[in-house]
Design a protein with these regions (language model features):
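Bacterial N-terminal signal peptides
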Residues: 7-16
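Subset of outer-membrane beta-barrel
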Residues: 21-536
Length: 536
């Protein structure tokens, strides 16, 4: 467990420089191929084929409070707040009672295809997705740093660590209903790979000189073959409990014997209404569904309060300059006081909902120049560890029918203000897009973090640094190949190709000779053939 938490914490630090809660800036980006993932009623200008490996990479992540409240520079070295050179007063003045919230949501597109069939737009794609999130109360950090000097009572409730990974295969369809309404849906088949959820809804610590009294309520659920969850017999409790310190990745994993840890399904639904040519109102609900996970391990806290005897030399602080050593030291101490009773529920299924989200937006195009628009977007995401809400305004400009840019500003409930930008370049065959939901203004140099994490098997792959303040962003990048005729213009409206026709010369009246004894029959007037507007 120490290894998992240490690596996860380092990974969150390493990816935060390019990470957010989704792709909000792209919602109104003209020509964006994967708009149907934000709202299934959005239709692409043309059909497309996504190149495997580079078609779409999305990483969403963030944290609050900022790393500047947790990482400190002492004697030229970057250390955590647990380092003994960081004073208790220095740490508490920066944290200011803030709870910790972190999230990481990578989304890798494996295959994607979009095509038009008549007036309907369809897509099929396969993706690898993951959700990792954690939430810890301020009292946990106060205990780790200040110990019994701060208080005799600590409330560690609402501690949550969640991680899940799954494969998604989805089919979507979007079509017009009348002249100004579009609706769409997206049906998903899900195959679970790994799931772990540790939820301590209640945990109160009453610290005595010789013994600590702990009252906790929570559980742990694990599904999948990628993690090993050992148990051990606790003589004091007289029960078999989880060996929390030794939870680790499976070392003898056999890919040939691998089976999904669960199956499930989900649906996206969305609609776009255009009451006027310059105004659109849209809304979508995404990821309504879940996965039935096969239980690998399940454990619960004891029904009664229990006591914990700390070691005489127990200390959360350390003089080590290694961030991983500091995290490991704290994790080891916390794990030793957590008792989770093992339950015999192997093989039983538990249905777990996906983190779902809802988007509502309004887009207003300039009446004098419809290549410029102002978009407003509200987002709610119901996450496993905490919920996320944001309001974003974007200014979008299609300089040409093949080149679009977008800039945005957002405010969210994580107390972050973010500024994002995106570009979409789609001349003919190629469609290339790149964007961020937030651009950091202050960073911690990468070299400082690399030195502190030197004992981990990876380096931070970013040249500048990682965000210093509280951060919530996202990066998306991809290349697709366009194919077929154009069915929508840059604004997502029906594409009408104008066909010029030459006027036929007027016909002079002709004298008709009718044989004697026959009547003249009425006939349809001659009309000049025209070429109607054609949708492409």
């Amino acid at each position: 467990m120490k290894r998992i938490i240490t690596t996860l914490a380092a990974a969150l630090i390493a990816t935060a420089a390019v990470s957010a809660q989704g792709l909000e800036t792209a919602y109104y980006l003209d020509g964006y191929t994967f708009g149907y993932r934000l709202n299934p009623s959005f239709m692409s200008e043309r059909g497309f084929f996504a190149l495997p490996g580079v078609s779409r990479l999305s990483i969403g992540a963030g944290y609050t409070p900022g790393l500047e409240n947790i990482l400190f520079v002492k004697d030229g070295k970057t250390v955590t707040f647990l380092n003994s050179n960081v004073t208790k007063e220095e740490f508490t003045s920066k944290m200011k009672g803030s709870d910790l919230k972190v999230h990481l949501t990578p989304d890798i597109n494996i295959l994607a295809l979009g095509f038009w069939n008549g007036d309907a737009f369809h897509t099929f794609d396969v993706s690898l997705k993951a959700n990792m999130a954690g939430a810890s109360p301020y009292d946990l950090f106060r205990l780790l740093k200040c110990g019994t000097e701060a208080s005799d009572v600590f409330d560690l409730s609402s501690n949550r660590v969640h991680g899940s990974a799954y494969l998604e295969a989805a089919f979507s369809s979007a079509f017009d209903v009348g002249d100004n309404l579009s609706i769409g849906y997206r049906i998903k088949g899900l195959a679970g790979l790994q799931y772990i959820d540790l939820n301590l809804s209640k945990m109160d610590l009453n610290l005595g000189r010789e013994k600590w009294e702990i009252a906790a309520s929570g559980d742990m659920f694990v599904s999948g073959d990628f993690l090993k969850v050992p148990g051990k017999y606790d003589e004091e409790l007289g029960k078999r409990v989880v060996d929390v310190e030794n939870i680790e990745p499976t070392s003898d994993f056999d890919i040939h014997r691998f089976r999904p840890a669960g199956y499930g399904g989900a649906v996206d639904i969305g609609a776009t209404w255009r009451p006027f040519d310059f105004l659109s109102v849209s809304g979508a609900v995404l990821d309504l569904g879940g996965i039935s996970w096969k239980t690998t391990a399940y454990a619960q806290t004891p029904d009664m309060a229990y006591t914990y005897t700390p070691a005489e030399d127990m200390s959360f602080e350390t003089a080590s300059e290694s961030i991983s050593d500091q995290i490991t030291n704290a994790t080891s101490a916390l794990s030793s006081m957590l008792y989770m009773e093992m339950k015999e529920e192997n093989g039983k299924g538990q249905f777990k909902m996906l983190p779902w989200s809802a988007n509502v937006g309004v887009n207003l195009r300039a009446p004098f120049y419809d290549r410029i628009s102002l978009g407003l977007l509200g987002v709610h995401r119901h996450g496993p560890a905490f919920n996320y809400n944001s309001a974003r305004a974007s200014l979008n400009w299609s300089l040409f029918k093949w080149f679009s840019i977008s800039g945005s500003v957002a405010k969210d409930n994580l107390k972050t203000t973010s500024y994002g930008g995106a570009i979409n370049f789609h001349p003919g065959l190629l469609n290339i897009f790149l964007g961020f939901d937030s651009i950091p203004t202050t960073v911690i140099p990468v070299k400082a973090i690399d030195d502190a994490l030197a004992d981990l098997p990876f380096k931070i792959p970013f040249a500048v640094g990682i965000p210093k303040s509280r951060f919530n962003t996202g990066i998306f990048f991809g290349v697709t190949l366009s194919m077929g005729q154009r069915h929508r213009d840059f604004a997502g409206r029906r594409y009408v190709k104008k066909v010029e026709t030459e006027s036929l010369p007027s016909l002079e009246p002709m004298e008709m000779i009718v044989p004697e004894g026959e009547e003249v029959k009425n006939s349809e007037p001659l009309t000049t053939p025209t070429s109607p507007d054609t949708n492409y």
